[in-house]
A protein has these predicted regions:
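Intrinsically disordered, low-complexity polar regions and short flexible loop motifs
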Residues: 1-145
Length: 145
């Protein structure tokens, strides 16, 4: 699949070719030089459960080389060492979930309230670079610096 992406006054083309069973997430992120670039994150799910939810962290922030995602108020390490330009995903029980992302031991953004996770559904946390240091999104919805 080929796509043309326009962000502000910049336009670029991106080709996406998926392998069978592969999921690809495409994001536009700041390139550090005042422009934008397209990034593809690929994952091949190892399992699916209709009784559990799936949650992932996508780390697009090179200034946060090892993000951690915890349950808000706890240091339980839902995800540890989520390296830049990588994705981690895992199955979790369908419970009410509020998570906090941290970079280098410091909270990044505000806690993300997913509400009740639904069985069989996929949820994502995005860690993005900004001039303020980092932006955290859940499923594409901005939640703070």
């Amino acid at each position: 699949m080929a796509a043309s992406i326009a962000v502000k006054n910049q336009k670029f083309d991106l080709e996406v070719v998926a392998k069978p069973g592969e999921f690809i997430t495409v994001a536009t992120v700041p390139n550090g030089a005042g422009g934008w670039t397209g990034v593809q994150m690929r994952e091949t799910p190892s399992s699916f459960s209709a009784t559990r939810a799936s949650i992932a962290v996508f780390n697009f922030n090179p200034a946060c080389p090892s993000a951690q995602v915890d349950s808000a108020g706890k240091a339980d390490g839902i995800f540890k060492n989520a390296t830049s330009k990588a994705v981690q995903r895992r199955l979790v029980s369908p419970v009410k979930a509020t998570v906090q992302v941290s970079c280098a031991g410091k909270a990044s953004g505000t806690p993300l309230d997913f509400g009740l996770l639904e069985p069989g559904e996929r949820y994502s946390v995005f860690v993005l670079p900004t001039q303020a240091g980092g932006l955290v999104l859940k499923d594409g919805i901005e939640t703070g610096q």
